[in-house]
């Protein structure tokens, strides 16, 4: 069903790096990192432009197509193999390693497990489940964990806002935004440039180097296009189908799932980023020590 596809795309994108990294960035830089989560509209390009293309090749080649398969078909065997190698190396260095690291930190803080036990255990358990359960198992787990993740994260957000506002969520929101506006991102000139907005336009703004005006949105769009429309980790969740299923049925389901995933993609701003900002505001009031912003979501 389309809602399973939407949940699977969303769950494929969410990992421990969001719980640790996105919340930590929120505690340090406010909503500057939210521009990555605003790229959900790219998933619509996957559903409307790329799924028909992939499905056409599926019918022609008789199997689920990956981008390396397409390059082998369109150009040469070597071209597709090189993309596979580059993608594998990139995933190990930028995705798997980061997920293992942040997962180890989170489990160490939450359960008291030694860092390496948590990091390696996370990789081993994920591998076992994927090998034994296959794509069907992954999709089923995604459908189960997505609502749990959303409900649990919003519960953390509301409890944090209530703690900040002395029992009032609305007061907590006001205090959090005021802290982001006046106490975060203070320049060398003593001026508070604020961390309650995504774009930083002036070079005197300390966060300009990390979030240089509108260019950061352009850069995120280019990377988002690659990730959401060509990355096999995402694409394979859209193209799941029964043997002999009609093209229009596959594409209609994929497009509906893409729409659902696009809406889901906005949620991490509220699920992870803003709880980090709440943690920073609570730490400023002396509620706890947060010298390590990576622990923002856990605390």
Where are these regions (language model features)?
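Interfacial loop/helix-cap signal at membrane boundaries in integral membrane proteins
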Residues: 3, 7, 182-208, 292-298
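Membrane-interface helix-loop-helix modules in multi-pass membrane proteins
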Residues: 2-63, 208-227, 231-239, 244-287, ...
